């Protein structure tokens, strides 16, 4: 069937900011889809609110709108652009929900917009729990015993019929938002009320738990001629009961018999045909390990996290082909881009094993609730490819960057066996490592199986890993055993530990005896057809398939899994760097291990190595490819941390030299530089012990900011007010040492300013200066940033420009530099300097049309900025006002305090742009999920130090018609100024404020921290209750002021004469 000619313009909806459950996989899918549609000759309009994505680059679509993904804003774009069609299945759950809302409100019909791909009725049939269950019953496909509820009372009725445990699944949500497993009445009440709150349809499915069944997924494709294929099937190592995004996954499935595999394959295809899916679709099934009984759990009628994994696991580009199916092409007429000879209707075959392990944020949120269930908690994931299951698992473990390199914990010896077993009996993010620890202590596999329900096949593989450890210990230095361990994915570091050698000695031993990996191609067809994809993985076998060319090469290190503090912004920079390398005539090679991203799409670079980002794995590639040099400044802290180790092997680090990278991080050297170039910084010292830190603080004066050196995303950073807090920090939060000193700085309150610049060694260009709305002390990644600055004087701007140029030249920066300043009462001070790409690079690149990462890469190759037409200093300002607003995923993470401080907590960002600051802020806040209303009720409970400041704020909110609730202390302060406020009781008292929040009486909460334990606990409960009820809670008065400005601009002020 030829493609459709009756449509010319297609609107694609992106997935918005990165949140838990919806990460970079949709940037990858959206980018592929837009390019595929353009390739077929359609005009593509894209709307997405996330500026940190490749898909929002002007080259990807014909028109790009970075606007909030709400019904009203998309409706405006539809009315303005008049597209012929809308493709909603590539923007995750956000895109689907938007399509449904636009359909129901009549916007699509009024503007003659057709929906492409899967029909709306099919989407609703798959997403609406009631309709789905009915369809399954008609098809005779078993679903778990279940009931649809719209109220908590109905849930209790169902519980009386079937008993516990019960699984709650809210309709039309993603990442399991609001869902969970209930074991008792209290949990049932809490989870169902939460689920009804998060479901746009106020509907939950309650099902009898089948926890303990195997969880199997099939990624399938279908076209309008009813051709349907299975792209990939995957098995969750964790049994049913843990969200698939939080499960360790293997592809292809390892424990199914052929009969089981074919049975589940047939069911998956039967279901997608019955639903009439056109495009990609993910089917999740549960299989009883002891019989042929199975249940269908759910169907996602769209491109998903699993389809990104399936695409990277097989090399089969699901999103690209799904977009083409949506415009009428069929599987049997599209070539498979990997082989270039076989058609897309051939099912991929794998001759390797894939392991995916989720990346959790608990290294940042140590107090977070770690227990895993049906609600997703991982921020990202890693994937590894091997020829044995053990090899792929161990490669994936060392890709995670938890400081864990093997199946066990660094301090594993210190736990007693009872504690280890206790940890295994709970499903959490560390269970895998505790299982390794238990096997090491001789626990039987039977006992572990009974505790976890993990299939014996996998437990035997874990046992094999531990057995090899013992063999290495018994045959220290034996080459046969070294080779054998390498076949099963052991790292040099792990072998060194068992051989009683250093990692470097094991590396040298391998080199002398020619024990090196070869690189195999990922070709979708197990080498049955000719294939020329430049997509490789390393393994210890004989034949190397990665042909080294004569061209000069540059190797770019990616940024690994998405986590808080290191998001998709770094992938954006990596991709742009690769494009610049290719334009300059070099061969570009990427090393990365994140299956969700654009950088690991094999069509982006000349060669892609899907490998862990460790010294050993990267050196193996460098030894084969012998690149001109390695670029580390675009891969976040992951890549920067490898620079030292690679340089020791004689590898050339391109761009800013290693010595200068270290000068920016080393306290004493950096201070010496600042004195030399005459740039002030807050008074500070470094401490290598608690005693030294106390002496430093006494000299500098409280409050002080304390943090470890060499970290990203402000990990373990705190503002402390006295000796007791400082002692606490030094003994609990960090292990200070001469190699890793702790920095103690004077805490200056003032405006925080962020600047990104590019330097070629001679010229420094500054694309833009951003002002933060929150004063210094809130991590820059969690602050609202505004471009251009709104409140700075000409003198301050000139000083910022001068200091930035001095710093970039003083550090001999070649490439990018990011600097944070604070403007305090008496001048501009530099807070920190990062000699690398930063979180704000995509944001500024979009605003100014200056392709910052590409210019930086060209400077690294040796081109001059003046030859490219740029003058030194701040570049001309773009028209309009732009804000970057942070987006948090607190509703997915229990027990995490949402107070903003120097440690980063946001998972993503949105951009708001308009002609005035208030309008841009309105868009930024709306896009980040804060509903801005021009009237309502605000609850204020602030610490004593903020009471004076909150008066003015209360007065303004009162004048625009907001009703004020306040706790007694705050209310008394407001009464002094004749501002009316209703007094609410403290937690547990009369007219308790938590009850008022839960009853929906409050639209905004303003709550600032009070130090001191009891109050902190109250404050923590208040903040968590707001999150669980979906109410914006502002913990910084600066954010509250900005929101008030927006409210004032939307409404009229009522003041008596």
UniProtKB/Swiss-Prot annotation:
Occurrences of domain ATP-grasp (ranges)? 133-327, 671-861
Per its UniProt record, what SUPFAM superfamilies does this chain match?
Carbamoyl phosphate synthetase, large subunit connection domain, Glutathione synthetase ATP-binding domain-like, Methylglyoxal synthase-like, PreATP-grasp domain
Provide a Gene Ontology MF annotation, just one: carbamoyl-phosphate synthase (ammonia) activity
The answer to whether UniProt assigns keyword Repressor to this entry is no
Q: Which residues does the annotation say bind Mg(2+) 2? A: 298, 300
Q: Which reaction does it catalyse?
A: hydrogencarbonate + L-glutamine + 2 ATP + H2O = carbamoyl phosphate + L-glutamate + 2 ADP + phosphate + 2 H(+)
Region (Carbamoyl phosphate synthetic domain) spans which residues?
547-929
Which positions does UniProt annotate for Mn(2+) 2 binding?
A: 298, 300
Cofactor binding note of this UniProt entry: Binds 4 Mg(2+) or Mn(2+) ions per subunit.
Record's CDD domains?
MGS_CPS_II
Any one cellular component term from GO for this entry? cytoplasm
* Ranges where the record places region Oligomerization domain: 402-546
- A Pfam family: CPSase_L_D3
The cofactors required by this protein are: Mg(2+); Mn(2+)
Q: What are the binding positions for ATP 1 in this chain?
A: 129, 169, 175-176, 208, 210, 215, 241-243, 284, 298
Residues where Mg(2+) 3 binds: 820, 832
Ranges where the record places region Allosteric domain:
930-1057
Subunit (UniProt)? Composed of two chains; the small (or glutamine) chain promotes the hydrolysis of glutamine to ammonia, which is used by the large (or ammonia) chain to synthesize carbamoyl phosphate. Tetramer of heterodimers (alpha,beta)4.
Could you say which protein family the record assigns here?
Belongs to the CarB family.
Recorded hits in NCBIfam families, A to Z, give: CPSaseII_lrg, PRK05294.1, PRK12815.1
Q: What is this protein called?
A: Carbamoyl phosphate synthase large chain
The source organism is Staphylococcus aureus (strain JH9)
């Amino acid at each position: 069937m030829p493609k459709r000619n009756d449509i010319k313009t297609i609107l694609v909806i992106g997935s918005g900011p990165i949140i838990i459950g919806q990460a970079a996989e949709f940037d990858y899918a959206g980018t592929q889809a837009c390019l595929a549609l353009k390739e077929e000759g359609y005009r593509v309009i894209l709307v997405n609110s996330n500026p940190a994505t490749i898909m929002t680059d002007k080259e990807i679509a014909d028109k790009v709108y970075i606007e909030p993904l709400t019904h009203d804003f998309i409706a405006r774009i539809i009315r303005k652009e008049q597209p012929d069609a809308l493709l909603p299945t590539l923007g995750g759950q956000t895109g689907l929900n938007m399509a449904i809302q636009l359909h129901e409100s009549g916007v699509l019909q009024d503007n003659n917009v057709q929906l492409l791909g899967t029909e709306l009725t099919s989407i609703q049939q798959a997403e609406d729990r009631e309709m789905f269950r009915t369809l399954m019953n008609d098809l005779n496909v078993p679903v778990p015993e279940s009931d649809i509820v719209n109220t908590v009372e109905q849930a209790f009725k169902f519980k009386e019929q079937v008993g516990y445990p019960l699984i709650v699944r809210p309709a039309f949500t993603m990442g399991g938002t609001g869902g969970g497993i209930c074991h008792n009445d209290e949990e049932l009440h809490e989870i169902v009320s939460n689920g009804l709150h998060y479901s746009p349809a106020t509907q939950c499915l309650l099902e009898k738990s089948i926890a303990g069944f195997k969880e199997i997924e099939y990624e399938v494709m279908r076209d309008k001629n009813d051709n349907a294929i299975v792209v990939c099937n995957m098995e969750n190592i964790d049994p049913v009961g843990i969200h698939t995004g939080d499960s360790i996954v293997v592809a292809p499935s390892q424990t199914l018999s052929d009969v089981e595999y074919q049975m589940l394959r047939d069911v998956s295809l039967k279901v997608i045909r019955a639903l009439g899916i056109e495009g990609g679709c993910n089917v999740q099934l549960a299989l009883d390990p002891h019989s042929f009984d199975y249940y269908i759990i759910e169907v996602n009628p769209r491109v998903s996290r699993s389809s990104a994994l399936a695409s990277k696991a097989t090399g089969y580009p699901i999103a690209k082909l799904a977009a083409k199916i949506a415009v009428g092409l069929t599987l049997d007429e599209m070539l498979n881009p990997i082989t270039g000879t076989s058609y897309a209707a051939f099912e991929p075959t794998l001759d390797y094993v894939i392991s995916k392990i989720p990346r959790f944020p608990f290294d940042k949120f140590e107090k977070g609730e770690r227990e895993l269930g049906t609600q997703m908690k991982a921020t990202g994931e890693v994937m590894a490819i091997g020829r044995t299951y053990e090899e792929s698992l161990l490669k994936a473990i060392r890709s995670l960057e938890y400081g864990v390199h093997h199946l066990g914990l660094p301090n594993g010896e210190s736990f007693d066996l009872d504690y280890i077993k206790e940890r295994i009996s709970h499903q959490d993010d560390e269970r895998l490592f505790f299982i390794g620890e238990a096997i090491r202590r001789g626990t039987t596999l039977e006992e572990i199986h009974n505790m976890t329900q993990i299939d014996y096949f996998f437990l035997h593989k874990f046992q094999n890993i531990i057995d090899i450890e013992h063999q290495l210990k018994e045959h220290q230095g034996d080459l046969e055993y070294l080779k054998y361990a390498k076949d099963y994915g052991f790292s040099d570091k792990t072998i060194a530990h068992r051989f009683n050698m250093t990692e470097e000695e094991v590396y040298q031993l391998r080199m002398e005896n020619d024990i090196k990996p070869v690189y195999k191609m990922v070709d979708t067809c197990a080498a049955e057809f000719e294939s020329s994809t430049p997509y490789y993985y390393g393994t210890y076998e004989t034949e190397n398939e990665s042909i080294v060319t004569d061209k000069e090469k540059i190797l770019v290190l990616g940024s690994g899994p998405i986590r808080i503090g290191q998001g998709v912004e770094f992938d954006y920079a990596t991709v742009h760097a690769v494009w610049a390398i290719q334009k300059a005539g070099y061969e570009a090679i990427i090393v990365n291990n994140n299956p969700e991203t654009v950088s690991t799409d094999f069509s982006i670079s000349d060669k892609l190595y899907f490998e862990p980002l460790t010294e050993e794995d990267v050196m193996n590639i460098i030894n084969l490819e012998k690149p001109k040099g390695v670029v580390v400044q675009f891969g976040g802290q992951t890549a920067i941390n490898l620079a030292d180790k690679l340089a020791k092997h004689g590898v050339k680090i391109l761009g800013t030299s290693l010595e200068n990278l270290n000068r920016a991080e080393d306290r004493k050297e950096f201070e010496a530089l600042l004195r030399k170039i005459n740039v002030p910084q807050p008074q500070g010292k470094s401490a290598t012990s608690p005693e030294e830190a106390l002496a430093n603080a006494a000299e500098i004066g409280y409050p002080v900011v304390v943090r470890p050196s060499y970290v990203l995303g402000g990990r373990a950073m705190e503002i402390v007010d006295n000796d007791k807090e400082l002692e606490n920090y030094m003994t609990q939060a960090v292990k200070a040492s001469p190699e890793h000193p702790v920095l103690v700085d004077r805490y200056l309150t003032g405006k925080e300013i962020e600047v990104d610049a590019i330097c070629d060694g001679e010229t420094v260009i500054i694309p833009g200066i951003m002002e933060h709305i929150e004063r210094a002390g809130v991590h820059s990644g969690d602050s609202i940033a505004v471009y251009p600055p709104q409140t700075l004087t000409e003198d301050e701007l000139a000083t910022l420009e001068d200091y930035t140029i001095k710093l970039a030249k003083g550090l001999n920066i070649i490439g990018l530099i990011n600097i944070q300043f604070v403007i305090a009462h008496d001048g501009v001070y530099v807070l920190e300097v990062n000699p690398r790409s930063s979180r704000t690079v995509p944001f500024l690149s979009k605003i100014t049309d200056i392709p910052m990462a590409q210019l930086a890469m060209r400077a690294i190759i040796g081109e001059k900025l003046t030859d490219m037409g740029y003058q030194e200093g701040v570049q001309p300002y773009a028209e309009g006002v732009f804000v970057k607003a942070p987006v948090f995923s607190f509703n997915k993470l229990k027990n995490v305090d949402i107070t903003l401080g120097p440690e980063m907590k946001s998972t993503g960002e949105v951009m708001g742009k308009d002609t005035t600051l208030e309008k841009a802020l309105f868009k930024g806040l709306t896009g980040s999920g804060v509903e801005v209303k021009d009237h309502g009720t605000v609850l204020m409970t602030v610490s004593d130090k903020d009471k004076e400041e909150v008066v003015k704020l209360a007065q303004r909110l009162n004048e625009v018609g907001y009703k004020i609730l306040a706790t007694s202390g705050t209310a008394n302060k407001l009464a002094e100024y004749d501002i009316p406020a209703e007094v609410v009781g403290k937690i547990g008292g009369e007219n308790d404020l938590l009850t008022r929040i839960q009853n929906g009486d409050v639209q905004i909460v303003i709550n600032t921290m009070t130090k001191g334990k009891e109050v902190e606990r109250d404050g923590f409960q208040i903040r968590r209750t707001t999150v669980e009820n979906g109410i914006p809670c502002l913990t910084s008065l600066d954010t509250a002021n900005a929101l008030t400005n927006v409210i004032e601009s939307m409404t009229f002020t009522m003041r008596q004469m």
